[in-house]
UniProtKB/Swiss-Prot annotation:
Contains an active site 4-methylidene-imidazol-5-one (MIO), which is formed autocatalytically by cyclization and dehydration of residues Ala-Ser-Gly. The modification 2,3-didehydroalanine (Ser) is found at S218. Keywords: Cytoplasm, Lyase, Phenylalanine catabolism, Phenylpropanoid metabolism. One of its GO terms (biological process) is cinnamic acid biosynthetic process. This is Phenylalanine ammonia-lyase. Belongs to the PAL/histidase family. PANTHER family: HISTIDINE AMMONIA-LYASE. CDD domains: PAL-HAL. It catalyses: L-phenylalanine = (E)-cinnamate + NH4(+). Pathway: Phenylpropanoid metabolism; trans-cinnamate biosynthesis; trans-cinnamate from L-phenylalanine: step 1/1. InterPro entries: Aromatic_Lyase (IPR001106), Fumarase/histidase_N (IPR024083), L-Aspartase-like (IPR008948), Phe/His_NH3-lyase_AS (IPR022313), Phe_NH3-lyase (IPR005922), Phe_NH3-lyase_shielding_dom_sf (IPR023144). There is a cross-link at A217-G219 (5-imidazolinone (Ala-Gly)).
Length: 713
């Protein structure tokens, strides 16, 4: 059973300070003196992705109420409200309430003037005029409530209803962001309307909102209209509450609330913003941050499984010669994860050319170049985090906007969600490229010709009857191909809309949805990678345990059969021949592999003892004895490994102290063990797919995030 996200995240929260509110306090307690670009509230060039994930976990897992003031909402707060049900309220600040009331009063004085969306029509119909400002808001909602949802409760009861609706967490996040934006007092939306939204959130009432139908140009008009209609008690609005779907009217009555009547501009103020796109983007980016940390952890584990070189992550290569900040960050993370590993090569000894023949001098690109590959992706995600922090926490997205200081109404394009859409394009590409490096690391590890003597397909028994990870190899290719397709831009598909008025638009919600979909596919791929790499480090542990007994055995048999002729130099040549052959015949079954290995090694003995009197009989006797003893030894080591309790797995003593944390999490808490094989055991166990599914669920639920933070902190 995976640990509770809340229990782990709370411990992280207790160790971190709330930087936003501390910054506000440092400004005399008045956050409203800050500008929208208040740098102290946002990621800086010194901020690492690990810092960001720690902060998100802390804010999301906090137990205090989120106070919305238009300036200090963090992305972690949005995650907390959306996924953890953190309660929210409009901050108890006289300044906020005064500003909101003043904007409402200023608008009242402008009702005789031509104000867009208050006395005029909407969009391309802004050439119409009306004096009935209240009815105009109803007309706005009427034409925007045009999405496709089930026509009866039976559709929801049969599980068909939510396939065309936004995830409930996205709607909750959108409501939180919209209230936060409206507290800034630029939209003339009354406190009572904002409190209607927070009451819905705090009573667990979530509007059912269509998945599609917005181009995120003049905000997310249609999705936000469904939210606005719900708080007015629209008779055809559906909501989710207490695990049930019911009408908004029923939910309002059930929870003892009151519907609101929208005043002038309040319908427009509710729907003319980017909150839905920003909410989906925030959740997608949060997941992408965690997947990035997991990709780095998997790189470290793959280095261990492949007996790779820690030197690829040396500070000289990154901090000194090519000091891109996020490349340095990724290299440092992987280097830190490898500290203390008995698998990874930490100190390379210079060797002569003749002693190095046939040996791969350095790791292949997927491991060696991973900081250079992942670093720029991390940079894009950190930038996306800064953009979304501004969008969700410190921005007014509406039109027109009220400028109280200058007593003006500004008509502009503050609703355009291109900033959100652009971050999602870059994030989704980063997600696809993370998948690419994971796929290449994984397939190298599964390939018997590339994986430094690991068994073919990571089979724990004879490869002729165990193809363990072969299906996963194919599945990983499918996931990677799909990621490549999803990486294509959405923004290039903009179409002119709404009488040509919205001739350019952002498609931000579509892009955010595609990014969330890409995250899901990457989660499948990384779950597959994690399953395989843990099997690989277990098999490598068996190899290391075998080597401890195997090398003395080779020494003993050389001396037993060749006496004083078996010098250290002869032994060294024979040993090199053996290990070279073991990297070439790892797709053979056990008995065939050892007989083949010592047939080849016999040639090394002949070469090493050239000029000495050695009979063919003694050579053959040595070859047969070595093969038989090696076969028996391998079987003994295997049986000991599988008989041992999982908590005493040999891999634990070879892994680094930090990668050991992730290994133990999967093996013990998620409950996915190393696999020996159905054919060998003579019975069918839990399928490979079920075990990968368990890891996938640990990723998707968020349980793995605190584990990754613990590893890297």
């Amino acid at each position: 059973m995976a640990p509770s996200v809340d229990s782990i995240a709370t411990s992280v929260a207790n160790s971190l300070s709330n930087g936003l509110h501390a910054a506000a306090a440092a400004n005399g307690g008045d956050v409203h003196k800050k500008t929208a670009g208040a740098g102290s509230l946002l990621p800086t060039t010194e901020t690492t992705q690990l810092d960001i994930v720690e902060r998100i976990l802390a804010d999301a897992g906090a137990t205090d109420q989120i106070k919305l003031d238009g300036y200090t909402l963090t992305l972690g707060d949005v995650v907390g409200a959306a996924r953890r049900g953190r309660s929210v309220k409009v901050a108890d600040s006289p300044h906020i309430r005064e500003k909101i009331d003043a904007s409402v009063e200023f608008l009242r004085t402008q009702l005789d003037n031509s104000v867009y969306g208050v006395t005029t029509g909407f969009g391309g119909s802004a050439d119409t005029r009306t004096e009935d400002a209240i009815s105009l808001q109803k007309a706005l909602l009427e034409h925007q409530l045009c999405g496709v949802l089930p026509t009866s409760m039976d559709g929801f009861a049969l599980g068909r209803g939510l396939e065309n609706s936004l995830p409930l967490e996205v709607v909750r996040g959108a409501m939180t962001i919209r209230v936060n934006s409206l507290t800034r007092g630029h939209s003339a939306v009354r406190i009572v309307v904002l409190e209607a939204l927070t009451n819905f959130l705090n009573h667990g009432i979530t509007p059912i909102v269509p998945l599609r139908g917005t181009i995120s140009a003049s905000g997310d008009l249609s999705p936000l209209s469904y939210i606005a209609a719900s708080i007015t008690g629209h008779p055809d609005s559906k909501v989710h509450v207490d695990g049930k779907i019911m009408s908004a009217q029923e939910a309002i009555a059930l929870k003892g609330l009151q519907p609101v009547v929208l005043g002038p501009k309040e319908g427009l103020g509710l729907v003319n913003g980017t909150a839905v796109s920003a909410s989906m983007a925030t959740l997608a980016l949060t997941d992408a941050h965690v997947l990035s940390l997991l990709a780095q952890a998997l790189t470290a584990l793959t280095v261990e499984a492949m007996v790779g070189h820690a030197g690829s992550f040396h500070p000289f290569l990154h901090d000194v010669t090519r000091p891109h900040p996020t490349q340095i960050e990724v290299a440092r993370n992987i280097r830190t994860l490898l500290e203390g590993s008995k698998y990874a090569v930490h100190h390379e000894t210079e060797v002569k050319v003749k002693d190095d023949e046939g040996i791969l001098r350095q790791d292949r690109y997927p491991l060696r170049c991973s900081p250079q590959w992942l670093g720029p992706l991390v940079s894009d995600m950190i930038h996306a985090h800064a953009v979304l922090s501004l969008e969700a926490g410190q921005s007014t997205t509406d039109n027109p906007l009220i400028d109280l200081e200058n007593k003006m109404t500004h008509h502009g394009g503050a609703f355009m969600a291109s900033s959100v859409g652009n971050t999602m394009e870059k994030t989704r590409l980063a997600v696809a490229l993370m998948g690419k490096v994971s796929f290449t690391q994984l397939t190298e590890m599964l390939n018997a010709g590339m994986n430094r003597a690991l068994p073919s397909c990571l089979a724990a028994e004879d490869p002729s009857l165990s193809y363990h990870c072969k299906g996963l190899d194919i599945a990983a290719a499918a996931y990677t191909s799909e990621l490549g397709h999803l990486a294509n831009p959405v923004s290039t598909h903009v179409q002119p809309a709404e009488m040509g008025n919205q001739a350019i638009n952002s498609l931000a919600l579509i892009s955010a949805r595609r990014t969330a979909e890409a995250n899901d596919v990457l989660s499948l791929l990384l779950a597959t990678h994690l399953y395989c790499v843990l099997q690989a480090v277990d098999l490598r542990a068996m190899e290391f345990e075998h080597t401890k007994a195997f090398e003395p055995m080779v020494t003993e048999l050389l001396k037993q059969h060749f006496g004083a002729l078996a010098t250290a130099e002869v032994e060294d040549k024979v040993r090199k021949s053996i290990y070279k052959r073991l990297q070439q015949n790892n797709s053979y079954d056990l008995e065939q592999r050892w007989h083949d290995t010592f047939s080849v090694a016999t040639g090394a003995v002949v070469e090493a003892l050239a000029g000495q009197e050695v009979s063919l009989a003694s050579l053959n006797a040595w070859k047969v004895a070595c093969a038989e003893k090696a076969i028996a030894l391998t079987r003994s080591v295997r049986d000991s490994f599988w008989a041992a309790p999982s908590s005493s797995s040999p891999a634990l003593k070879y892994l680094s102290p930090r990668t050991r944390v992730l290994y133990s999490f999967v093996r013990e808490e998620v409950g996915v063990k190393a696999r020996r094989g159905d054919v060998y055991l003579g019975k069918q166990e839990v399928t490979i797919g079920t075990n990968v599914s368990r890891i996938y669920e640990a990723i998707k639920s968020g349980c793995i995030a605190p584990v990754l933070v613990k590893m890297m902190a």
